């Protein structure tokens, strides 16, 4: 019997820093090709204010087998799932700051495969995050399904006084009351925050309500995060540590482009009508079909406006079902000094289904508290095989005036935990030589 191939080890921990998040994929593929991480069953710890788990809607599933074409097709919100369908990634722990909650807390098991009717990549999860983009299909509609185990884990800030408590073995940080808006508290009241195993054909949460209530108190603490991660990452596992710097401070860049009134109108146009609680397959498919038509109609409407946004065209489009708000929106946009960018308007609308993108510009103190939180749970994990970092500053998801400071602090904690780093600043106009990081 042939012995399994020897696992290769980097002399120093490689850290690839890119600007746009999907640019990390080429570096992950290179690590697969060099056999530093396995071809399949890859585990990823993903720190981000956004899940990045959407799917290129119209991309043929077989594109994943053509690396160069795939890299051209990917975008910042959809770079992980193609790697799942390709069979590379099987476990993702999405660690999100307390201000960002696009997917229910807990464990979700789903399948990612090729939709037999459209030949595109689709998913069996029934979570609103996927339903609102019309990405759900039943398991029996998928060819070559691959299982994805997704763990959604909240991270709360840790203040210096709590660091002392943690060193004495006490529980970690809780979300400060001042940071809990009424919407946040209602969301937590409505959302089960327990980690529960779920079947591959969906991701509906279940569990005893009283047990859920007891567990809520510890969500976000260092001990809670550590327990969840160590259930996924074993000491000998090669894994990817992926960090978007907007995890520490995050903007919704569309807030600078549109007024609150325009956002309200976009929400009316793009509002997602959820299925009833515990929907059957027929209701789910009707929901997906309805949402697909809605998004296609909106895309077509804004494409028409690119050609002609005169009064007659706007009135004709606004007369269609669900399009009433279009008239006021276009009127508001045309009152600006510069002509509307209707393609950008549509992109903004796609973020306004039932919730806006996360927006929390952190103070320097808040950034440090999140840095401390990350350091505390990372020190309990084995050393990652590779680290990928996205700056997300040119598209303004991470504030440009904060990104360099955050990057320095993140590199500092990585070096303090894992020793000398092999840092590649891939975002610079002239790529820097691979260098060891010094504080």
Curated annotation (Swiss-Prot):
Q: A single Pfam family, by name? A: UPF0489
- Top-rank taxon, per record: Eukaryota
Region labeled Disordered — which residues?
163-219
Tell me which InterPro entries the record gives.
UPF0489
Instruction: Return the Polar residues bias intervals.
Output: 179-211
Q: Describe the family membership recorded for this protein in Swiss-Prot or TrEMBL.
A: Belongs to the UPF0489 family.
PANTHER family according to UniProt? MISEXPRESSION SUPPRESSOR OF RAS 6, UPF0489 PROTEIN C5ORF22
Under what name is this protein listed?
Answer: UPF0489 protein C5orf22 homolog
């Amino acid at each position: 019997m042939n012995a399994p191939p020897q696992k290769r080890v980097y002399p120093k921990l490689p850290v690839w820093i890119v600007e746009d998040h999907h640019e990390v994929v080429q570096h992950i593929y290179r690590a697969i090709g060099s056999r530093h991480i396995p071809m399949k069953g890859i585990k990823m710890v993903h720190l981000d204010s956004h899940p990045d788990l959407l799917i290129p809607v119209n991309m043929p599933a077989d594109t994943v087998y053509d690396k160069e074409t795939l890299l051209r097709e990917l975008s910042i919100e959809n770079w992980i799932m193609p790697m799942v369908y390709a069979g590379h990634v099987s476990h993702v722990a999405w660690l999100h700051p307390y201000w960002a909650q696009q997917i229910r807390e807990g464990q979700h098991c789903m399948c990612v495969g090729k939709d037999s009717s459209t030949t595109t990549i689709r998913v069996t999860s029934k979570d609103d995050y996927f339903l609102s983009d019309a990405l759900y299909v039943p398991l029996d509609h998928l060819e070559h399904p691959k299982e994805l185990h997704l763990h959604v884990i909240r991270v709360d800030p840790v203040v210096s006084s709590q660091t002392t408590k943690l060193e004495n073995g006490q529980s970690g940080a809780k979300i400060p009351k001042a940071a809990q808006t009424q919407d946040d508290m209602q969301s937590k009241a409505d959302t089960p925050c327990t980690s529960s195993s779920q079947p591959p054909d969906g991701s509906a949460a279940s569990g005893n309500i009283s047990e859920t209530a007891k567990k809520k108190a510890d969500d976000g603490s260092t001990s809670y995060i550590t327990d969840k991660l160590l259930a996924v990452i074993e000491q000998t596992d090669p894994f990817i540590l992926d960090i978007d710097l907007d995890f520490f401070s995050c903007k919704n860049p569309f807030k600078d482009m549109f007024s609150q009134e325009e956002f309200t109108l976009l929400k009316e146009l793009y509002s997602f009508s959820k299925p009833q609680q515990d929907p059957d397959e027929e209701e789910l498919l009707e929901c997906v079909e309805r949402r697909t038509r809605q998004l296609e109609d909106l895309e077509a409407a804004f494409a028409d406006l690119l050609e002609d946004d005169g009064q007659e065209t706007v009135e004709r489009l606004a007369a269609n079902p669900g399009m009433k708000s279009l008239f006021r929106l276009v009127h508001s946009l045309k009152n600006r000094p510069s002509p509307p960018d209707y393609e950008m308007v549509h992109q903004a609308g796609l973020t306004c289904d039932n919730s806006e993108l996360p927006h929390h510009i952190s103070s320097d103190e808040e950034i440090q508290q999140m840095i401390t939180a990350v350091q505390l749970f990372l020190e309990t994990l084995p050393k990652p095989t590779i680290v990928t970092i996205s700056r997300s500053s040119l598209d303004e998801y991470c504030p440009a005036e904060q990104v360099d400071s955050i990057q320095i602090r993140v590199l500092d904690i990585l070096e303090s935990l894992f020793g000398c780093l092999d840092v590649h600043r891939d975002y610079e106009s002239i790529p820097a030589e691979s260098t060891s990081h010094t504080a």
